[in-house]
Amino acid sequence: MKNFLVLVCVVGLPFYVLSQSYYQWVERADSCIKAKDWAGAESALVSALRTEPANGQNSLLMSNLGTVQRYAGNYEAALRSYTNGLLMTPHSVTLLRNRAALFSEIDSIDRAYQDYSQILLIDDTDEDALYHRGLIALERGDTISSRADFERILKLNPASANGRIGFASLLKVMGYYPEAIEVYSQVIRVNPEKEILYVGRAEAYLFAGQYAKADKDIGKAIELAPDDPVVYVLRALGKLARYERESAKADLKRAVELGYDSKEAERLLEEE
């Protein structure tokens, strides 16, 4: 604190001026974020950090900076920001959660798994971390660990939608399609506007060969989230299963326009 006061005297500016400048940058960043002006938000956050590099709130700003950079598609910068924030506050669940989400987005699932596990060392009742770690375990083929995480969620909160969605995903992977469909249906009755539920149930319907029901769920998912590329990929898979190649190709093209990997789309077409 003494060093900080000396710095203020040297530069000849009163504390309130520096503080005001810092919070003005923070407010500007907030306005840019609301307007989805990611470049403006990044610039404002960096300016705030430079204005008061010792401010105790900088860990939170680093988290916000990382998220802004992530939304802008600058994943390397986002990773640096989250990691630098964790150097300031190693036990920040918010930073760990944000970095885990970024790792998942860039397919670094092992590192995402580690961050979610770190969150659970801090708070073993964190439902979000249990849910996402369970999904990653499922993606890795570890159904035992996946089931343990989903069971833990339901033990903590028997009414948890995440716990039930996790179990439905587990049942689907294990080939128990009717059971998975039933669990999805139970959750949909309580959460009728949640797009991911219709996507999950539609996939189970596709695997079960119930294409008409899958189409209905996909239609609802598109109504709820028309910019989600996964929905169009799912619809394309249903069409490919019925040899509707040209229509499926159009859906995959739309998915790529929305951000789906073009090489993966080509691979799906080649497999059929």
What does each model-identified segment do?
Residues 58-61, 95, 129, 163, ...:
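TPR alpha-solenoid repeat register
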Residues 34-35, 68-71, 105-106, 139-140, ...:
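Register position in tetratricopeptide repeats
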Residues 60-64, 98, 132, 166, ...:
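Canonical tetratricopeptide repeat
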Residues 51-54, 88, 122, 156, ...:
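Structural marker of alpha-solenoid helical repeat scaffolds
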Residues 21, 55-58, 92, 126, ...:
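Residue-level recognition of tetratricopeptide repeat
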